[in-house]
Amino acid sequence: MEKAALPEEIIEHILTFLPVKSLIRFTCVSKRFRSIILSDPKFAQSQFQAARDRKTLDHRLLYSIDGPRFESLDLKTPSFGDPSSVRKLKLPFPSPSSAVVLLGSCNGIVFLAFAEKIFYMWNPSTGFFKKIPHPGFSRIDNELLFYDVGYLPAADDYRVLVVSMDCIDIKNEGAIYSSKAHAWKTLEADVLSIISYQGTFLKEALHWLDAQDEIVAFDLTQQEEHKFRKMLLPRAFEDRNFSSVGVFAGECLSLAHCPMAAADCILVWVMREYGVRDSWTKLFNLNFNSWTSHCLYTCYCNTESSNGILSCYV
């Protein structure tokens, strides 16, 4: 009597309830399991969603320490100096070059750009990776000006936006990648003066600071007209010095700002109502030693415990 085989969708559903460590062990069970876990981006999204619903997600900061060498830091650790909170990561594919840019991440999927515009998407938890085609810029040595990554749940599609500068013809070239179509679309980006490389994803849009003390936004749901729009900063916003855009509590744009008049202080603002300038609210001030006034900084807020953590990187 033949044993009844479980349908593929039932197996995938069961696997989504397993933690990542167990999933990695299951890749050795069979080629079928290995293919589902490591090669199916839809399974990765389902597993991520299940972990988020169960509130078992790990919140980790991914960073590059030396070219294509990566580490991740557990943001829930009591002390950032604890070596047990750091995990060394290894690329599951040969690194195309020693120069790499971390374009961004979304739902545990990381997007990388190597020299000569070689792009990859990578899931550090499962080892899944996929090479992305060249965006079609006129020259492969163009410098990346700004970039970011977002995910559209209704379309089940990851989008990557990159803008590079053609140093010969002095013009910007932009392109947006769709993981669903596995292709790029070009867009106009000549009028922009973005001052922050890495963007911020919120409300299905990407956001950057520009040189005019405004936030430039790009709606990822656009189908035909790929246009940028601008949002105003707080009316009380002082002279721009060091600033960065982030997300507070998963639903509000935030702004960390170091005014020149008070170089030993960081002001954190929150836009309570998206797109409404008058909804900007000053959340708190953070004072620190003046020697750190020229640091790059990122804000992390743990809303579950109501703790705010501000990290400065020299």
PLM regions and their residue ranges:
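N-terminal entry/capping and adjacent linker segments that precede and initiate structured domains
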Residues: M1-V314
